[in-house]
Amino acid sequence: MSVLFISDLHLEAERPDITRAFLSFLDERARRAEALYILGDFFEAWIGDDGMDAFQHSIASALRQVADGGTRLYLMHGNRDFLIGQAFCREAGCTLLPDPSVIDLYGEPVLLMHGDSLCTRDEAYMRLRRWLRNPLTLWVLRHLPLATRHKLARKLRKESRAQTRMKAVDIIDVTPDEVPLAMRRHGVRTLIHGHTHRPAEHALEVDGQPARRIVLGDWDRQGWALEIDANGHRQAPFPL
């Protein structure tokens, strides 16, 4: 059996093509896998488990069916859905992973991240990230009225899109020097992350030893999945 990794689906009711592709992916591939790891930005936005709508409940139900079939499900926060909590995870049958996390993958320690924390050259975003992830900020956000949270989420998404268009490509990508630092800190030679929407595999050295960074693809014009088993790994796109 294999282990699957996906990220950056940005699921929302307004993109039924992505939803259909994801449900097919669950039926055709995830049910046969040992585990599925979703490394952030699973949803386009998340205002809190208490604000789940019918669409989000339907996604949780689909995940639960896969979990009940024996596939282990793991979910990591992204920059769009960091308010996902234990209520959703219980409903979906998945385990919420901290970012970063180290897992044992066929005898090798592997570092998993969403990836946004590696983009340190984007100083404005890093300041916003630190503020949003502050425990006090999280508490306040979760206790705001739902209508206020919806309004704030729309505002943040609009500003994020505008700023991304204005920033240089290298600013919003991973800072190269941060990668070996993170890998050395966690004692790994393999890092898997998403966030940048630039699927690729990068070779590097950490303390003189060969290492690799696998970047997951986003689900916009096509879907992406990384599949790893005891014999190797393969990341490939597929149509929505």
Curated annotation (Swiss-Prot):
GO terms for biological process: lipid A biosynthetic process. Disulfide bonds: none annotated. Binds 2 Mn(2+) ions per subunit in a binuclear metal center. It catalyses: UDP-2-N,3-O-bis[(3R)-3-hydroxytetradecanoyl]-alpha-D-glucosamine + H2O = 2-N,3-O-bis[(3R)-3-hydroxytetradecanoyl]-alpha-D-glucosaminyl 1-phosphate + UMP + 2 H(+). Signal peptide: none annotated. Mn(2+) 2 binds at residues 41, 79, 114, 195. Its EC number is 3.6.1.54. It is found in: Cell inner membrane. Substrate binds at residues 79-80, 122, 160, 164, 167, 195. Its cofactor is Mn(2+). It is a peripheral membrane protein. Pfam families: Metallophos. InterPro entries: Calcineurin-like_PHP_ApaH (IPR004843), LpxH-like (IPR043461), Metallo-depent_PP-like (IPR029052), UDP-diacylglucosamine_Hdrlase (IPR010138). Pathway: Glycolipid biosynthesis; lipid IV(A) biosynthesis; lipid IV(A) from (3R)-3-hydroxytetradecanoyl-[acyl-carrier-protein] and UDP-N-acetyl-alpha-D-glucosamine: step 4/6. Belongs to the LpxH family. Hydrolyzes the pyrophosphate bond of UDP-2,3-diacylglucosamine to yield 2,3-diacylglucosamine 1-phosphate (lipid X) and UMP by catalyzing the attack of water at the alpha-P atom. Involved in the biosynthesis of lipid A, a phosphorylated glycolipid that anchors the lipopolysaccharide to the outer membrane of the cell. This is UDP-2,3-diacylglucosamine hydrolase.
